[in-house]
Structure formats: C-alpha cells, structure tokens
C-alpha cells in the first residue's frame, strides 16, 4: 500500500477492464515520472471523452453529435444493417473494408446468468429501424460465444416475420472469441461467407 493519492490513483486504474493491481501500479508510476504536459493531455482527453462523446441516436455507436459518422455518411448503403454487440465491434468490421452498410450496436448480448435480457439491449430500437422497409438484409455479427449465439438466435426469431434476409457471419471466427480480436483477413472472410439464418 502506498500513501494517500498514489494509492487512490492505483485503485482507480485497477478498476479499468484488463488492468490488474501490478499493471495499475506500473501505470501510476509511469504517470508520476511522465512529463506534466503529457499527463495534462491525458487528463484532458479523459475529461473531453466523457463530456463530448455520446451514443448515436440511430445506431448507438459512439458519436460526437446526434448521428455517428457512419449514419451521417450518404455513401453508406441504408439497405444493409450489421448488428454488433459493442462499438469496438464496429471498429473491427470497418478495418476489413468489406461492409458498406450501416450498423446497429446492441449494447451487449443476452446473458440470463449475468442478468442481461432482451429488454436491456437496443433491440426495440432495431425493430423500429427495420419497420420502414428500407432494410433488406440484416447481418448478425454478434460474438461467436454462447451469449452471442443466443442473441443472434433471439434476433432471428424476432425479425423472421418481417421477411428480411437475415445472415450470420461465417465460421472462421473462433468459438468463444470476441470480434475485436479477430484479424482483418479472418473477419473479412467471415463477412464474405456469411450464411442465411432461419428462425
């Protein structure tokens, strides 16, 4: 244990995902030794991201205005929506340059054990987006793990009465993995080989 504010910093850093006690300590001491200008720049970036970043009113991706840059881009194909769990998944798919449609970020996956049900996700908003008839294909790009599969199956059943083409990314993604860790080639091939999902 360190004194006062040093320990407070270590404790706060340790609350971040993927940062254990040792990493938190290393980061804290790096910040203590860093140039004050660099530390102020980091503090400003943290403050600004909380003050200026919001969620897109259409797709729930991160945005600095009402619509994210993808939803406001007229070159994107409005007839195809790719459903992902988190904004980081949008970034992973965008890196492939395979998809030119729009996205819908659910904000997680169905996980009854974790207390996350369909009503806790942006599923109602997705159904509302599909109601106007513009969308012809819905691509389910949830993570290839149990929660992602449950979520994809639930969505396929909910969307089936609308008569849309519903596809799922092809295999090649490891079961139990996360989209954000897939390389561009694997994710691109999964996109190319997506399969139709039946309810």
Swiss-Prot record:
SMART domains attached to this UniProt entry: HhH1 (SM00278), TOPRIM (SM00493)
Q: Where is the Toprim domain?
A: 79-174
Q: Please give one Gene Ontology molecular function term for this protein.
A: DNA binding
Record key words, sorted? DNA damage, DNA recombination, DNA repair, Metal-binding, Zinc, Zinc-finger
UniProt KW Zinc keyword:
yes
Keyword Membrane, does the record have it?
no
A GO BP entry is: DNA recombination
| Origin superkingdom | Bacteria
The C4-type zinc finger ranges are: 56-71
Which Pfam family, an example, fits this chain? RecR_C
Question: Which InterPro entries does this entry report, sorted A to Z?
Answer: DNA_Rcmb_RecR (IPR000093), Hlx-hairpin-Hlx_DNA-bd_motif (IPR003583), Rcmb_RecR (IPR023627), Rcmb_RecR_Znf (IPR015967), TOPRIM_dom (IPR006171), TOPRIM_RecR (IPR034137)
Similarity comment: family membership = Belongs to the RecR family.
The entry's function note states: May play a role in DNA repair. It seems to be involved in an RecBC-independent recombinational process of DNA repair. It may act with RecF and RecO.
Q: Which PANTHER family does this UniProt record tie to the protein?
A: RECOMBINATION PROTEIN RECR (PTHR30446:SF0)
* HAMAP family for the chain: RecR
Q: What is this protein called?
A: Recombination protein RecR
Q: Which gene encodes it?
A: recR
């Amino acid at each position: 244990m360190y004194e006062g504010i040093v320990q407070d910093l270590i404790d706060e850093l340790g609350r971040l995902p993927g940062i254990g006690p040792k990493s938190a300590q290393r980061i804290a001491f790096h910040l203590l030794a860093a140039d004050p200008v660099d530390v102020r720049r980091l503090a400003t970036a943290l403050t600004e991201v909380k003050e200026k970043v919001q969620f897109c009113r259409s797709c729930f991706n991160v945005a600095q205005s009402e619509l994210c840059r993808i939803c406001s881009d007229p070159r994107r194909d409005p007839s195809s929506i790719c459903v992902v769990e988190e904004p980081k998944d949008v970034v992973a798919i965008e890196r492939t340059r395979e998809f030119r449609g729009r996205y819908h970020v659910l904000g997680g996956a169905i996980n009854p054990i974790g207390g996350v049900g369909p009503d806790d996700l942006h599923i109602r908003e997705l159904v509302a987006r599909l109601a106007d008839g513009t969308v012809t294909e819905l691509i389910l790009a949830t993570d290839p793990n149990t929660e992602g599969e449950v979520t994809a199956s639930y969505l396929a059943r909910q969307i089936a009465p609308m008569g849309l083409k519903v596809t799922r990314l092809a295999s090649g993604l490891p079961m139990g993995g996360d989209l954000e860790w897939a390389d561009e080639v694997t994710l691109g091939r999964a996109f190319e080989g997506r399969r139709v999902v039946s309810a």
